[in-house]
Regions:
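Catalytic-domain carbohydrate-binding cleft regions of carbohydrate-active enzymes
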Residues: 2-305
Length: 305
């Protein structure tokens, strides 16, 4: 949006280069590597009117459930926790008279470096169904962490590879890297069967009592790949975040209803505001990070989130 009463949407899902006051201090320029350039000029005349017209075009977020506006508590990146640890966190909040609405299990509810195969670690959580029942009896909603990757260490990795559910290189070999976990591969959500497999795992967790999902990652999608449906790898780099969050959102909408559906999402692209809510990325518990989060929230709000 500009101070002259209009907004601009560059309608390209691939990388877009913006020059903001660099070549000419009074101008913003944008470009894409393509044979054409498509963009929309959205009239105002006020910022509110621009945003209203933009969301008519790209979609509007559903109103999140009332409980999602309460306080969330997370294990964060605690690497060694069990039900007793979880209860110590929750009881500590009660002792301090801090009302709690949601408890979130981050990545180590699953076995380390098998992310994401949706199986509770039986050594630390031998009775996940019972634990969830006990936590919900305290009036809590339950959120669990997921991502769109699968570690080579997972027992289901070979099955997923053989069925073609994972992203491939142009030569047909499996695309992998080691930057998050050894031998990481990416679910190919352009494959309908891969989507069904992933969605069924989520539905199993919902049936267990899970209320929402932290859809972590979804960015840094490689471009030296071959998608199941033949999609352009350059365009999928950003669009992947949309189809990933859409898949998880639809599972919740179909199981608990749109009025109760909510995500705890990290990545996004144009239109992903339809799948609320998003968080501003990892931050520290200090005043500097609080300021960063406030600035991020203001920016996201003006981007329709």
């Amino acid at each position: 949006m500009t101070n002259r009463g209009y907004g601009v949407l560059v309608n390209h899902p691939q990388c877009v280069s913006f020059e903001v006051g660099s070549e000419k201090v009074s101008k913003v320029q944008f470009s894409v590597e393509s044979e054409y350039l498509e963009y929309f000029v959205i009239d105002g005349p006020t910022p509110k009117a621009v945003l209203d017209r933009y969301t008519r075009f790209t979609g509007r977020p559903a109103l999140p459930p009332a409980w999602s506006f309460g306080l969330w508590l997370t294990t964060s990146f605690t690497t060694n926790y069990d039900e007793a640890t979880v209860n110590s966190f929750i009881d500590g909040m009660a002792e301090r008279n801090l009302p709690l609405h949601v408890f979130h299990f981050d990545c180590f509810w699953m076995k380390a470096f098998q992310w994401c195969d949706f199986e509770w670690d039986p050594l630390t959580f031998p009775d996940p169904e019972g634990m969830i029942r006990r936590l919900k009896a305290k009036g809590l909603k339950i959120c669990v962490w997921i991502n769109p990757y699968i570690g080579q260490k997972s027992p289901v990795f070979k099955e997923l590879q053989e069925k073609g559910y994972l992203l491939k290189r142009p030569d047909g070999s499996l695309w992998q890297w080691d930057k998050w976990q050894p031998g990481l591969a990416i679910y190919d959500f352009t494959n309908p069967d891969a989507c069904k497999w992933y969605a069924d795992k989520l539905k199993g967790l919902v049936a267990m009592g899970v209320d929402c999902f932290k859809t972590d990652f979804g960015e840094r999608i490689p471009t030296d790949v071959q998608w199941f449906d033949g999609s352009d790898p350059q365009k999928m780099h950003n669009h992947y975040a949309y189809i990933y969050n859409e898949l998880v959102w639809n599972v919740l909408k179909d199981t608990v209803g749109e009025e109760e559906a909510v995500l705890f999402a990290r990545s996004a692209s144009v239109g992903a505001q339809k799948f609320p809510v998003h968080w501003g990325g990892d931050c520290y518990a200090n005043y500097e990070s609080m300021a960063e989060s406030l600035r991020g929230g203001l920016s996201m709000g003006l981007s329709a989130f």
